[in-house]
Curated annotation (Swiss-Prot):
Residues 1-20 form the signal peptide. Keywords: Glycoprotein, Hydrolase, Secreted, Signal. CDD domains: biotinidase_like. This is Biotinidase. It comes from the Eukaryota. Residues 30-309 form the CN hydrolase domain. Its main location: secreted. InterPro entries: Biotinidase-like_euk (IPR012101), Biotinidase/VNN (IPR040154), C-N_Hydrolase (IPR003010), C-N_Hydrolase_sf (IPR036526), Vanin_C (IPR043957). It is an enzyme of class 3 (hydrolase).
Amino acid sequence: MFSFGTVFTFALLLIPLTEAVDSSYVAAVYEHNLILNPDPRVPLSRLEALQHLQKNLDIFEVQAARAAQQGAQIIVFPEDGLHGFNFSRTSISAYLETVPDPEQESWNPCLEPLRHNNTEVLQQLSCMARRNNLYLVANMADLQPCSVSAAPSSCPPDGRWQFNTNVVFRSDGLLVARYHKYNLYFEAAFDAPPEPEIVTFDTPFAGKFGLITCFDILFQEPTVILVEKGVRQIIFPAAWMNQLPLLDIIQFQRAFSLGANVTLLAANIRNDQLIMTGSGIYTPFSATYHHAQRGDPEEGRLLVARVPVLDPEWLGHNAASGEAAAVDESSGYCYSETCLDSPASTAPVFVSSMMYDPFTFALLNATDGEMRVCNGTFCCYLQYRWVTETGRTELYALGAFDGTHTVNGRYAVQVCALVRCAGSDASSCGQEVDEAESKLDFMLEGKFASRHVYPSVLSSGMVLEQPERVEAAADGRVSLKHSNVMGGLVTACLYGRMHHLDTA
């Protein structure tokens, strides 16, 4: 059995998403068991805040040095990794530093520490990058003064913006990028910037990278905008609370990398109480990732991997467009236009809540077969075959949902999911499960109203599986084929984001 605490690495040959790449670089991400402020609602003095920040900075220093020793050229630390969470707007005040805009001002905090007051964290991060000769990405709390009296003004009443902010330092310590998180997730201490920021930075070893933070990954701005602008390498600090069966962070990190055809450097917090774990270095053809097991020591984890450069400008040619692979007509699976027009499942359908959304489900009752389940006019199609009989006591269902998710965020989705149910009753379908014994070969297909569809296969023990085949057609049909599953199947999913249907 696989352990959650294991670092997994796999390389794969997916559908031909890009041309072969003969250039590479070494990336590192650090999953940080951060030292928290025990009472974040109580305001501190600047000295007290610095004493707390220093405890986490000292850990960052050790990990940056370890990464550099392994040849890393860039390291990513997680969201909230220095200060923590659950502050009020007032109580975070002592943690704030004003981060200058690198597009307006060239500043190396390590070499010019006296240029700006109250920038101790910026100075230490700058020197950390410089000492270890690597690019460094960290997340911190930023204060930007603004004018309340200006008309019109979106400035907060206290005359300052407080931003959840990613900062990037060049290998010589120069501050080269600043990104203010746009899609906040219950963050009372911070403001969303008035407009979404599309922020990139260039490196001499891999070209261009784009910056997003945690909840941003689910939204059009800035994430999809970056990808549509041709940014193929994304930095992703996160403090992500996992939720099965569809949005465990490693599951969606991998799905996003595949669906968007990008490299994702993802660093998460490790906090067992908040169900936070899961970091990785993902490309369209490889993944190195870590997911802790319940009961594992609550500690940090450094991941280092060599990955191909994907920036087409750096490579000097255009990357492939991501067209679907040729259909394998001998596969035994249906890829014709009639797949989704197949007769509806003879199994009765039922509604059960999954991720707080009312999915329409049908049970897999046969050893093999095909079925179609619809939620409104959105339909999901499945062909399946049980490979082993040992897991036939486990219940599986095909689920479909087309609508707006409204709990802990509001966004429109279309989802096709093959899930193992938590128990032997249909009402358990959609509940959280992380173990399974059943092995199935399958092809899952849906016709989506968006190009932004993210495929994933998750097997027992929080192990990611490489989909054998993913195809996307011009008419919105997306299919996910997988066989020879390594472990019991927990979830297979096509997660579509309907950005054009999002409402405030």
